[in-house]
Amino acid sequence: MAVEEREKLYPIIDYIAKEIFLEIKNRRIKLNPIKYDERYDPLAKKVREIGVSSMKQQCYDYIAVNACKEMFLAKISHYQCASLKNKGQLFGKQAIETWVRTNPSKCKWIFKADVKKFYPSVSHDNIKKFLKRDIKNKDMLYIIYTLIDTYKEGLCIGSYLSQYLANYYLSYAYHFVTEMLYTERRGKRQNLIHHALFYMDDIILLGSNKKHVKKAAMLLQEYLEKHLLLTLKPTHQLFPLNSRPIDMMGYKIYSYKTTVRRRIFNNANKVFVRNKGKEIISLEDSYKIISYYGYFKHTFSKKYIKKVKLDKTLKIAKEVISNEARSKVL
């Protein structure tokens, strides 16, 4: 956007800012209802309800997050991933790889679980209780409470604020399991687990002692139910690292290599094979190719990449997307 065109927007932005200020000051925030759309997630093989909020509500989301970001980031642990800058699937994968390969004696036993219907299960009253304890600014509490009350139930998938609230809420469980669970032997404190990683509501605990990891998992489950009013899915697993890979974030992580999850591999393979050797690739497939490529780039997949000539296909896909972006600007 040219400087002249940008300057024309300044009076409008100034007017909107004043209106928002008055709404907050007078406790009269008015927002249109969130529209919900059901979308199928092919990777998870489930239908997700995505909330699409008004532009005005999105502005309030950014106001709330920017004002509270320092507090959110102080609470959210380093090994809580998803929906945070530079802390996505690759970050989580690399952390687990480092743990199981540099010090496998501390990762002999794995507990893996995920929270049952996490987003819709977050109690509005309960999360407000935590926020009230951590935020002392009454205006900010009013804004966040108002935004939370617009959600049909729990938190809202698709909301910028909800991404931070989700990680913030689970941070209490993370700190509990990593800092509060230990045994004392001969006057020395020994943590029940050595490592923990939360990929949003997917949870993994790693330790050297089966009994200790099992106890930590049980106490974590009790904490979630009592303090966060959440439950784990009954499909949670406790297993030795040498018996199977850690299947998480789209990867299968072994103690000696990492591969792509079978379902993702099959979906990606269809797209790669369909476009192998093509000079013209559709825009839809181009986006898929770039999306899937990351999984193969960071796994034990060099032979496969060479077999399907993925580097050449990727180059064409990037050109297609680049040309599409330029055409929109023009």
Question: What does each model-found stretch correspond to?
Answer:
Residues 83-92, 195-196, 204, 238-243:
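Beta-rich nucleic-acid/ligand-interaction surfaces
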Residues 45-77, 152-180:
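Conserved pre-motif C helix in the palm subdomain of viral-like polymerases
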